[in-house]
Amino acid sequence: MTRRFLLLCRHCLLAGVILAALPARVAHAATAATVPLIPLPAQLDVERGSFNVDAHTSIVVADHAASTQRTARYLAELIASTRGLHLPVRQGAATASSIVLLRDPHAPVVNREGYALDVAPQGIRITARDDAGLFYGAVTLWQLLTPDAQRGAVQLPAMHIRDQPRFAWRGLMLDSARHFQSVAEIEQLLNQMAQHKLNVFHWHLTDDQGWRIQIKRYPELTRLGAWRRPPNAGHDGEPQRYGGFYTQDDIRRVVAYAAARHITVVPEIDMPGHAQAVVAAYPQFGVTGRRPPVSVDWGVNPYLYNVDDATFRFITDVLDEVMALFPSKYIHVGGDEAVKDQWQASLAVQAKMRALGLKDEDALQGWLIDRVGRYLDAHGRRLIGWDEILDGGVPADATVMSWRGTKGAIRAAQQGHDVVLSPAPDLYLDQLQSDRAGETAGRMPVRDLASVYSFEPVPKELDAAQAQHVLGAQANAWTEHMPTMQHVEHAAFPRLAALSEVDWSPAASRDWGNFTRRLPAQFARYRTQGIAYADSAFAADIALDRNAALASGTAQVSLSNQAGSGVLHYTLDGSVPGRDSPEYHAPLTVKLPATVRAVTLGADGSMLAAPRQRVLSRAELLSVSGNEMPNCPGSDFRLRVQPLPDAASLAPVYSVNLFNTCQSYPSTPMDGIATIRVDAVRLERNYALAHEAKLVVSHPHATPFGELVVHQDRCDGPVLASIPLPDPARSARNFTLQATLPAQRGEHALCLLYTAPTDGPLYALDRAALLPEGVAP
């Protein structure tokens, strides 16, 4: 009797599957919990019976295609490295206890990336009509064989999988311009993309902060344009210069490595904006003729390409070498955030506009993009660009990547253009995954795992015909705040697991609870392969009414996690919690002082996140991290940043609002409070805000370097203290400020506001503590 599980249904649990008792050394790949697959297949049927994969199992290549041999070897190597099973690969007919791989023009799934996977008591068979489908079938089998972190044999239930992707474009963009990654690091990322069935690697290779691709006709692009001098260079761990580039041999290696995993590499050469590194190398291709340094400022810099014929020859020369290296049909030309000030100020550019009969600078950008698009068309390629390319008119066959929300995708699809959904902040991996104090550097607001999983690539505003233009969705790893690959991996995983299901699986099969129950197996795979994934979704949040605890000496403590999944266990004595610790069911009454530690465990007792801790004492409750303080009302551009932008370490991070250096200390009983102590930090102000610079609030200051001003309740409330900031040239980066506060009664919030000049360093709060009378600062 067959139990059928169509993954077009909302619930895809292998409930009720009956497996024979197994020896202790053999793991179950599917139990009554969930099938350990991400992304979820389009259709899965489970039957009675099982097949045991062990050291006696062989992988059989049943056709004569070299590509099938490569997939078989890939599967064998993956199983060996993650499961410890060394399965021989041979060519020929299937035998008992074998895994058969076969390219078959009559395979049941027609889609070129689709496959059929059948597990029977006699063996396993993967068939597909194309190499890509066979590869993805092998990836699915590998996931079935790695349901946990154990080594050795695995027993699979008999099953039939018929699978194919929902979308053709399943992408990840990596920014190698702001921070540089080695070829080996990129190869590790490509490995993970393949295991998540992602098939487009969008490689951001040029920007204001660095040119990363060798162009032999223009050697200054990498001799000068690939390197920048960081703020505070040579001090406090900041390098004297930062940069790097990929030789053409490096590029070929990455492209070949990706192709072997059925990933297309789409290069991005940004134009006409984000061009400061180009102009630093070849100022004649800029507008002003002046040579700027390669930028150290994150954001929107003013440098644009010129629009004369010499500059266009430079662009086409570069594209010729790019096309020779990248076989991708698509070439990404950027087109975003091109601030037109230099064009507006240039007499030559304005004369060019008049000669072309163009009404404005947006139309001039449209003219440039159209000219580049026609050049790419003539060479058998297709232009793709960010959604700003719509503003000045766009080539008829151009593809639009929508990043300013989904409006660009809607507009483009309604005009008949193919689109890729890549909206900020929804699919921007530099957005923080939680607002916990210990989260790494990145941008606010939070975009957690659940928000990525809930993203729908087809906007509801499109009709059925227009929806056919949606190629898929892509996540973007912008690396301003990711100086190391560890930062990138923390930002990308497991959010890419969520995206893979958005891009691959049928929309109707999406089920958050089911997805979270499949994540423990994926986390085990990450750990086995050394991936520094984020555990933010399962990290325990320890919450309480702070003021009630301060007043009564007893706290009502609530535990939760983002995922709403797993089992929470806790201790109250500071010891490490585990499955033998009390299980959380309802708020806890905890007498101060105490140390609450909590952890989320999976159904099998595995730890889904590292334990989190909160010390409950009067002193700790009166001490608040700057990362936990909200911004003051008004203009808001909130980041968490490291003190040094290019330091290659997981340094502490600090919350800043680029528009207004002001934060709110929460309302607190102020009776008996005598002193405020602030641990402060001085940061680099390396941000290019372009026209948004007018939003930066400048506060009057009474001393040369500004003050930290403490207001009662609101930022226009009574001044309780004003503490001068030290001379940045003669003080440490981290320093402490303190002041006596006037006597107050009742509960009050505090506004903590820096008045430092906006042309100098940026300041942040590490921690602010209130000290009662009689407590030494």
Which stretches of residues belong to each language-model region?
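Bacterial N-terminal signal peptides
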Residues: 9-21
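Sec/Tat signal peptide C-region and signal peptidase I cleavage site
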Residues: 25-28
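Contiguous, structured surface segment used for ligand recognition
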Residues: 30-169, 487, 503-525, 529
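Short, compositionally stereotyped local motifs that mark structural "simplifiers"
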Residues: 60, 510, 516-646, 684-692, ...
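Feature activates predominantly on carbohydrate-active enzymes
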Residues: 108-312, 316, 321-330, 371, ...
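Active-site neighborhood of glycoside hydrolase catalytic domains
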Residues: 278, 283, 294-296, 300-397, ...
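Flexible, acidic glycine-rich loops studded with aromatic residues
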Residues: 383-398, 404-556
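Extracytoplasmic
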Residues: 612-777
